[in-house]
């Protein structure tokens, strides 16, 4: 008896569907329609924001979120640069190259981009968006980094934030980032390791390690 091949499809939830609630949620958190995310989507979707789900046999097992740099939730700037906010495939769906399938969906969708950028972490306690993963699995390279620590939790642990770059053309100019702005964290995604909690009164939730006595 021939084994049934898995049914795989990729769906863009920014175009409206039964999965549209995924604009406000991901695998790391339950559905929460928080205000900062709503405000961000109102600005970003008209400028080219995309969130796509990978559905395996009618179950959501992966996602990717990307946007032109000028509408990114990260302080990254660049000419015709696409910023990947996140990419994720559930562990139970590993081993089928589904992450690469999602990634190539972005590359194909944005073939005219000069290149692709993202942020990656090294020595951070979160397993998400690791530098080695971005390099080994998708071909990104680190073009700049800074070593910081969190001012609200795990305060003794330093980790690195890397600006990652994947040029799409030989003459592409690499992106730039605002390190000072990034010390404030990000507020467009509750699940992101660099998330700035709305309730904190501190403007900057990270500080550079070398500045600490």
For the regions a language model picked out, list residue spans one by one.
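Short amphipathic alpha-helix that is part of the acyltransferase structural core
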Residues: 1-47, 51-53, 189, 193-201, ...
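A conserved beta-strand-loop-helix scaffold within acyl/acetyltransferase catalytic domains
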Residues: 33-58, 62-82, 87
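A short, internal acetyl-CoA/4′-phosphopantetheine-binding micro-motif in the GNAT/acyltransferase core
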Residues: 85-95, 121-123
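Conserved acetyl-CoA-binding loop-helix of GNAT-fold acetyltransferases
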Residues: 89, 95-108
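Conserved active-site alpha-helix within GNAT-family acetyltransferase domains
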Residues: 122-149
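C-terminal "cap" of GNAT-fold acetyltransferases
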Residues: 148-213
